[in-house]
Amino acid sequence: MSMADRDGFIWYDGELVPWREATTHVLTHSLHYGLAVFEGVRAYNTDIGTAIFRLKEHTERLFNSGRIYLMNIPYSRERLMEAQREVVRANKLEACYIRPIAFYGSEKMGVSPKGAGVHVAIAAWPWGAYLGVEGMEKGIRVKTSSYARHHINVTMARAKFAGTYANSILANQEATMDGYDEALLLDVDGFVAEGSGENLFIVKNGKLYEPELTSALIGITRDAVITVAREFGLEVTSKRITRDDVYIADEAFFTGTAAEVTPIRELDNRPIGSGGRGPITEKIQKAFFDIVHGRNPKYREWLTPIQ
């Protein structure tokens, strides 16, 4: 089914409009120059009904992305948080992916967006395991990309903005065309950065490591995983990680709103650890799903009911 040809509603510039009518002009500035900021958010079915995971943090990151790129989003944080709840309710969804996006309109053309209006849209739709149900259980195969992740002074890694994803698309296409499930990108110095749309963790000798975040997005799921891991008594360290550090890790996994917690069983045809989902990964994965489905009352504050 085409993303454009669906029933339902999209929140567009302050109003719920029929899905097929949520359109914009072909001369929209952001379509040509790539300057749009967006979020990926998930809602889950919980014991308190449908609830959005870490809505406040995702909305804050959207506004931070706008600030980095001098984009003044014309709504308050509170309005956009309510709009995300509203669009889930309007589409009668129990579990879904939510995509808020702010972009420049068609009021002008040219590299500078000055004079173009900022528009905001929010869509929501059902979306299961991003990297596959089997991958969640058995782990995925990953290829180190020949494309480097952006240097911090090329694009701003603290922003989740559309233009960055051209780099991600190249890496992901290269990996999937070669028969892998996902790509791992290195930074310009040759150290591990992140996946095409995920943060990376490795496990070695009972400790958890993540790459330094110079060239990687500060993931919200990543932050949740670190919190849970430390609650388990695991030491979590951010440091420069090499590709061969991943080769000889005991376990590895990706995190992200779409990817959730996805084990990595292989990198560049080299099995990671036992070549499947490791015990620490499985423990963290279970804890994560307990939290997002409302089964852990300690983290209830991370869930915002849609009603």
Per-range role (PLM):
Residues 1-75, 79-86, 109-307:
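Helix-start/capping segments and mature chain N-termini
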Residues 89-96, 234:
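Short secondary-structure junctions
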Residues 103-108:
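Short, internal active-site loops enriched in acidic
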